[in-house]
């Protein structure tokens, strides 16, 4: 039995929760550390980089959820660890004002937990989608879940940003705790029972689990999987490299205020949303182009958009092109992301 559209939407709520928590760590805390606390910009950059580096454990989380047969548990526990890490990261940032070393140590621990939580929850969720979704619905399923993640990012940033005005450390701690609690509760309610119904309707013979190293070696031996892995490594490095750079670049090169640069980031996420929606409709509904073609278009378009952003910063008249170039970058990022996820699920299936 494959997932219904309602079940796919429910799993998308988990992605929404992931986006809601992660954006607070990579955007809100980043700004507060650099602007309000006047800490070196390299510090939040390293902390955000740490949470991405920890996610190299994703293959192991996927393997564990596959072999132990309870992805729901990994999704819920991962979200709980992420929520705890988010609260501790906020607390560590507050401590840095009076006890810098203690706050830094707590922040390192917190961002480690954030990376583990995102890896466990996000990977197990995608594994469930890949194995339980009808092949004809995979591109649409990827689009729905990732659109909901972008939606969660946009809504959380907007609501929390308004609630934080005027800023206070106590208020930020309260908001992060509230978002974390809501994320864990919504994740539990959204995913509960989906995997059990799919497993009971599609029984498979029990097999002895393959050891992780043996399974990894088997996958790596497959030419398509190996090449796709290397491609994703390179492309996602480029995809996330601009995350902590775009807003400072807009301020330094074009004189945008923090509010204006935040709006620029929102415009980029709007482009990502449209790009994902475009590929979902075109690839699944209208049968236009293959996922491979959409991936290539997304990568080439992203490269050209990023090059344009770099070049317009060298000319006085370039400010007029900043917004359209940023939206275009988001559009092509979204096209690439959802097509790549769809291709990954096709390989897994």
List PLM regions with ranges.
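Glycine-rich segments within core transmembrane alpha-helices of 12-TM secondary carriers
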Residues: 54-58, 139-164, 268
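Short amphipathic helix-loop junctions that connect adjacent transmembrane helices
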Residues: 27-43, 244-262
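Pair of pore-lining "gating" transmembrane helices in MFS-fold secondary transporters
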Residues: 1-35, 112, 220-242
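Juxtamembrane intracellular "pre-TM" segments in multi-pass secondary transporters
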Residues: 1-5, 195-229, 253
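Helix-to-loop junctions at the C-terminal end of transmembrane segments
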Residues: 56-70, 164, 275-292
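C-terminal ends and interior cores of transmembrane alpha-helices
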Residues: 79-101, 299-317
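C-terminal transmembrane helical hairpin of 12-TM major facilitator-type secondary transporters
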Residues: 292-340
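Cytoplasmic membrane-interface "Motif A"-like loop-to-helix N-cap segments
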Residues: 66-84, 100, 284-300
């Amino acid at each position: 039995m494959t997932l219904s559209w309602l079940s796919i939407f429910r799993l998308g709520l988990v992605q929404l929760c992931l986006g809601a928590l992660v954006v607070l760590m990579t955007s809100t805390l980043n700004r507060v550390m650099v602007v309000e606390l006047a800490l070196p910009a390299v510090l939040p950059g390293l902390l955000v980089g740490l949470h991405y580096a920890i996610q190299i454990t994703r293959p192991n989380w996927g393997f564990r959820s596959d072999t132990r047969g309870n992805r729901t548990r990994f999704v819920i526990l991962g979200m709980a660890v992420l929520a705890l890490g988010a609260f501790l990261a906020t607390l560590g940032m507050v401590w840095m004002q009076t006890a810098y070393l203690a706050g830094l140590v707590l922040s390192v621990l917190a961002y480690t937990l954030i990376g583990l939580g995102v890896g466990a929850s996000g990977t197990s969720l995608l594994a469930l989608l890949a194995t339980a979704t009808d092949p004809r619905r995979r591109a649409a399923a990827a689009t729905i879940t990732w659109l909901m993640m972008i939606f969660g990012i946009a809504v959380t940033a907007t609501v929390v940003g308004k609630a934080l005005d005027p800023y206070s450390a106590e208020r930020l701690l309260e908001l992060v705790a509230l978002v974390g609690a809501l994320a864990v509760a919504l994740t539990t309610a959204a995913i509960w029972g989906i995997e059990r119904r799919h497993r009971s309707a599609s029984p498979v013979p029990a097999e002895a689990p393959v050891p992780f190293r043996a399974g990894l070696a088997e996958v790596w031996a497959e030419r398509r999987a190996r090449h796709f892995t290397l491609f994703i490594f390179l492309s996602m490095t480029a995809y996330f490299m601009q995350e902590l750079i775009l807003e400072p670049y807009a301020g330094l090169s074009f004189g945008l205020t923090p509010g204006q640069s935040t709006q620029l980031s929102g415009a980029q996420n709007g482009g990502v949303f449209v790009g994902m929606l475009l590929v979902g409709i075109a690839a699944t509904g209208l049968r236009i182009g293959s996922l491979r073609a959409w991936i290539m278009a997304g990568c080439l378009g992203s490269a050209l958009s990023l090059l344009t952003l770099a070049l317009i910063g060298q000319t006085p008249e370039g400010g007029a092109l900043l917004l359209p170039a940023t939206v275009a970058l988001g559009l092509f990022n979204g096209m690439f992301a959802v097509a790549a996820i769809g291709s990954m699920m096709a390989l897994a299936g």
